[in-house]
Amino acid sequence: MEELLHYVWKHRIFPLNELTTTTGQRLEIIDTGLANRDAGPDFFNAKIKIDGVVWVGNIEIHTNSSDWFKHGHHQNPVYNNVILHIATCVDTEVHRSNGESIPQLQLDCPKHIQENFKELANTDQYPPCYRIIPSLPKLTIHSWMSALQMERFEQKNAHLIERLRYCNNHWEDAFFITLARNFGFSINADAFEEWAKHIPLRAVDKHRDSLFQVEAFFFGQAGTLSDPDGDDYYLKLKREYVYLAHKFELSPMDITRWRFLRLRPNNFPHVRIAQLASLYHRSYGLLSQLMEKETIREIRDLLRGGTSEYWSNHYTFEGCSPDGPKTLSESSLNLIIINTIVPFLYAYGIHRGKEKLCSRATGFLEELRPENNYIIRMWSQCGLKVAHAGDSQALIQLKKEYCDKRKCLYCRIGYEYLKRR
């Protein structure tokens, strides 16, 4: 109920005329303030008028006014700037830590909002607000999608900066971990990230001219060269890895971290590792090269690559496949661009103050086709137009950060749903 009161107050869904405090003072709401999701009062810098006197300060909201004392606000100086206390049930007076009384407003949550909120909270449908999607103004949808896209950019930027710190501010290292994670797609993302953290890129750089040695590094650190027996190529890689592991004091990851069940041969970790080995063998300073590419076609051409000859007819060291190149599909390339290249362009642009890179990142999303997954299909079935990857990224953000967390009160579509009668 308290969350709903926050919503009602923030959006002024209550009669604004002839408001009075619980002691009969005339009350006018000029500005409801800025919502605070952290510790402290619920709304900052509100502006109200009581009996003609303007007050600027904070707002605190409770279901019962006695909650003020239960939460210890009467002893906390942080709440001394509260100028209005709001409660559905006013069962006591409240005061600041210095004993001063605080004006109170008795505020009910309208019945239709309570009923609409229960509908959203109790439905198993996704999206829960599907009924109103076709009736929403295009401007409402467009502005919310734009905000969600930027929110996703900022969230990914924060994650990348954390990864950059982990890599001691080596952008190439952070990029390699991110790229590897996305080469694992949904099934092996965590395993690929762990694997990438086992790869000593400075050591790999010293042997980068040899694809065979890069493969020895990559497959050895993946834990895939532990069997004593295998074909000639496997045994050569194993011997090379033993030499490199001794030279650079390497230890491989646990091979059981890899998942193989229900994977197509071209999606097996071995194939993805071989593709990454080929990419790093032929693309020194990969991140720098990608930063210079101005078109999606150029990026695709750089990433597409292939593998060494051995992998043209293998998907593991034991498993053979029909002879043919093992290149990334168009849809896989698009996902890697969306989830790796675009976020890095944006993060690097922010970090270096290069607006051009940020604009290029957002522009790439508008050029790429939207992702095709359950989330996007469900929204499309509701009548929402998903035109490009920027839209699909916005909807993924909406699902993960609002729908899954039941944060309908903070969603603009949720706002439209709740206020309907």
Predicted regions located by residue number:
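N-terminal ordered "arm"
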Residues: 7-64, 79
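Compact, glycine/acidic-enriched structural inserts
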Residues: 80-82, 86-143
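Short Cys/His-based metal-binding microdomains
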Residues: 63-66, 75-82, 89
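N-terminal "leader" segments that precede or initiate the main folded domain
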Residues: 1-6
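Short loop/turn segments at secondary-structure transitions that flank enzyme active sites
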Residues: 65-67, 90-92, 111-113, 185, ...
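Cysteine-cluster motifs in flexible loop/terminal segments that predominantly coordinate metals
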Residues: 393-421
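Catalytic micro-motifs at enzyme active sites that drive phosphoryl/nucleotidyl and oxygen chemistry
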Residues: 32-37, 45-50, 68-75, 90-96, ...
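Hydrophobic, aromatic-lined core segments that form the binding pocket/scaffold
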Residues: 148-394, 407
